[in-house]
Amino acid sequence: MQSWPTPEVPALAGTPVPLELFDTADQEVRLVETPPAGSDTPVGMYVCGITPYDSTHLGHAATYLAFDLIYRILLDNDHDVHYVQNITDVDDPLFERAARDGVDWRDLGTSQINLFRSDMEALSIIPPKDYIGAIESIDEVIEMVKTLLDEGAAYIVEDAEYPDVYASINATDKFGYESNYDAATMAEFFAERGGDPDRPGKKNPMDALLWRAAREGEPSWESPFGAGRPGWHIECSAIATNRLGHSFDIQGGGSDLIFPHHEFSAAHAEAAHGVERMAKHYVHAGMISQDGVKMSKSLGNLEFVSRLTAAGHEPGAIRLGVFANHYRGNRDWNAESLATAEQRLATWREAARAATNREDAIAVVEQLRAHLSADLDTPGALAAVDNWAAGIDTTAGSKEFTEVGNIVVAAIDALLGVQL
């Protein structure tokens, strides 16, 4: 599937800072293990994509902006990045929304994917190298399910009408290591987030669906274990490991995906391929609320990127509004967030038109690198530029950025993805 155009990312002079990120599994900030800088071996990064029926709300955008920062810092450190993202273009929520709106689910998916692409392009988010729909990966999923069945890590329920295939929660002895949740929390989230603990015939209530046997009115594909369609988690396991290898560098997404989705995606891959960890780093971005209320489809309080840009708000201001708080925390978005970001953007531009002190400009670039490489400390990075701008007399500024100002302008573009 086609992604979207790649924004130009300026190359910066000076010394980059190696990236450290919080790992959800280990519960600590540590250095991201990467191939040597400048080598032909890329950093492998997989980020879960959208289910295309409500694109692109600010919660989506905040997650992809966090991983865009990671991509940019890796580029600054002279790493190539093999970024993979999926699209869950065959799933129950998509079917339900299409039925509600009286449209074909394929048409709804196509329109929302196109909107998502345009929003990502507007926000200057670097696209994935591989942008893969679940439908495109059916053969890969079938092969992985077959492997899990052959390994005894999966089973077919005894149900003549709907012989679904499930993964055994006991297939690996480390289940739960990524989320660090206790059994009660896992059971609660499994039931709330797409699981089917009461499905008759399962060996364990938390065994995860790998292959849903064909039902009337649903799309299905032939397989050695009967016609059907993929479960949610196995799609990501197959798409990621078939492109990045059985164990890769970074798996990420929103914090609501930690369990069950990411826990099971990792467990399926580890059981199928016999690896210790699917990813060396598990990275998760917090949720977005609006005016103190969790932003969600069910509440109908979603803020959409396309609405903000259509209203004349600059993508750079949207980025700065999201970056005002740390990516791992749950953040609130309101009119003040956007107004503050727009004022910040204007202040930085004024400073770049009047800056003359080269040493100060070089220093703020160093500070940007240091803050962003320290687990994406965007509040610190923004404060560093604020402090630089506050020290500049802008009364005699010109209409164009000064030579010195362009040093900072390039760094803000390259590292924060914000064009002044």
Swiss-Prot record:
Cofactor details (free text): Binds 1 zinc ion per subunit.
Q: Name one GO biological process term.
A: mycothiol biosynthetic process
Cystines in this chain: none
Binding locations of L-cysteinyl-5'-AMP: 48-51, 63, 86-88, 232, 254-256, 288
What is catalysed by this protein? 1D-myo-inositol 2-amino-2-deoxy-alpha-D-glucopyranoside + L-cysteine + ATP = 1D-myo-inositol 2-(L-cysteinylamino)-2-deoxy-alpha-D-glucopyranoside + AMP + diphosphate + H(+)
Residues holding Zn(2+): 48, 236, 261
Cofactor(s) listed in the protein's UniProt record? Zn(2+)
Motif 'HIGH' region: residue span? 50-60
Renumbered to this chain, motif 'ERGGDP' region spans: 192-197
Location of the motif 'KMSKS' region: 294-298
The record's listing under Pfam families reads: tRNA-synt_1e (PF01406)
Q: What does this protein do?
A: Catalyzes the ATP-dependent condensation of GlcN-Ins and L-cysteine to form L-Cys-GlcN-Ins.
> Family per UniProt?
Belongs to the class-I aminoacyl-tRNA synthetase family. MshC subfamily.
Q: What is this protein called?
A: L-cysteine:1D-myo-inositol 2-amino-2-deoxy-alpha-D-glucopyranoside ligase
- Organism of origin is Corynebacterium glutamicum (strain R)
Gene name tied to this protein: mshC
